[in-house]
Amino acid sequence: MDYMDIFQAYLDGSISISSAEIQMRNLAKNLQNSGKMGEHAKAILCITYFKRYTQYNTGRIKTGDFMLFMRDFILFVGRFRFPRLVTDAVLRDGAPFGVFVAADGAVDVLEKVPKAIEEHNNFIKEVYRLGEGSNDALEEASGDAYVHHFTKFHTYRSFEQKLAVHCALELPNDHTLMISLPTGGGKSLITQLLAAFHKRLTVVVVPTVSLAKDQYLQAIECISDEETKKNIFSFQSGGDNSKMIKGVEEKTARLIFTSPEAILKGEHFGKALRQAAEDGYLYNVVIDEAHIVPDWGANFRPEFQIFSVVLREWRILSGKSIRTYLLSATLSDDVIDVLFDLFGSESGNAKFRCDALRKEPRYMICENHSYEHRERQIVEMVKLLPKPLIVYVIEPSVAKRYIKLLKEEGLSNVFTYTGDTKDKERDLLLEQWKNNEFDIMIATSAFGMGVDKSNVRTIVHA
C-alpha cells in the first residue's frame, strides 16, 4: 500500500487512526531509505494530519489552527472527502483560510499567494509539488563497524559523509581538520562517533543555545552505545551543570555541547576542562558552524576568537595530543585562512571539502511603507505560504507582538523561541518542533542556526 491507500483506508473507516499512523510511519521509513523523498514528505504530512486531527478533536488547538494546516495538507497531498467533524469545521470556519467543501463533497482550497510576492507564484507551486520529478537525493553508502556498533544507523547518508567520518576518526594527534559538508549532509554524526569511538572527552563548541539543545537531543537519539549515551551533556546557561562538571572531573563524560562563553566565564567548568587536557582525557575539540567565527568573533561575540587562546593552552597541557575539528556547510577561502590562523595546529592542518550548491531556495524581497504595513504582510505570509514556517524578528518584544496579531486571526498553535525562553521550555519547544506538533515558530537569532529539521519550507525575516 502507498500513502494514498493507507490514508484512504483510514478515511473509509477500514482502519483506525492509530493503525493508520503505524502503517504510515513504517511506509515513511521505507520511502526515506529508498530515496523517494517526495512520497516520504507526503507520508509525513499524513502522519501530521493524524496529530492535528487529534489535537483539534481534543480541544488542544483552535479551528483556525486546524484550517491553516488543512490548507497546506490539501495543497501538498491532495483533496479528500474527510470525516463529518472536519467538513463541518470547514463549512463553518474555512473561508478565511481559503478552505471549502466542493460540490463533490471533497475538501478543497483556493490557490492564493501573498500580494507582496505574487510574481513568485510559480515557484510557490513548485514547493507544494515537493520536488516531484527531481533526482537530487544523495546516494547512500554502505555502513561499517563504526555506524553498526555505535549508532542506530545501518548505512551512511552519502559516500561523502562516510569519507568525512573516516577522516575525522583517523586524524593524527595535534592536527586540525576542516570538514565542509552540504546542509543536511550529516555533520552531526562526526561528533557523535568521535565521542563513542575514542572513549575520551569530546567538546563541541556551538554558537547558539538552540543548536546545543538540538545536537544534544540528536546525539541521545542516534548513539546506540549506552555508556556514551548516558554521559552526553549540554551546558545549561544559568542552570545546574554540576553533574556535567563531575563527569569531566571523574573522566566519565564523553560528549559536551557548550559555548565559548561557558568555557571562558564558567570558573569550575573551565578549570575542569583545563585539568582534563593536562590529564590527556580531553581529546577532541569541535567548532561547529565554524564559518560564523570570523564575523561573530570580531564584531559580536569576541569569545569565539578568544577561545582559540584557551585551545592553544589546552594543547600545550595535553602534550600536543588534542585534535581539532572545524565543521561547516559554508566556507569561503578567506574564512578558511582566518580559521586556520585561529585554530590551526602546529603538527598540520587538513581540509575535507564536499561543498554543494543548494538549488531549492528562492529569495524574495518585499517593500513595506510602515510598521503596520509590514505586520499585515507578515500575517498574510504566515497564513498563505508553505509550512513549517519560521518568522525571524529582531527582539523578543516583536515576537510577542506577532503572537498577539496571529491570535487575533484565530491562531493559537504558534510559539516563540527567543533569548527570554527558559531552558526547560526550550527543550520542549525543540522536541515539539522536530516532531511536527506545530508549524509556525516566531523566533530571534537564539533559534535556528544548525537546528536539524528537514521539512522547513518558508523563512520570513521580519
For each predicted feature, which ranges?
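Gly/serine-rich nucleotide phosphate-binding loop at the start of the catalytic core
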Residues: 204
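Short acidic donor-binding loop at the edge of a beta-strand
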Residues: 201
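Glycine-centered small-residue hotspots that permit tight backbone geometry or close packing
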Residues: 118-123, 149-154, 184, 297, ...
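Helicase motor core with emphasis on the C-terminal RecA-like subdomain
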Residues: 159, 169-178, 182-198, 213-236, ...
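Conserved Rossmann-like nucleotide-cofactor binding loop
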Residues: 210
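N-terminal accessory nucleic-acid engagement/regulatory domains that precede
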Residues: 1-137, 249
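Conserved pre-motif I regulatory segment
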Residues: 130-180
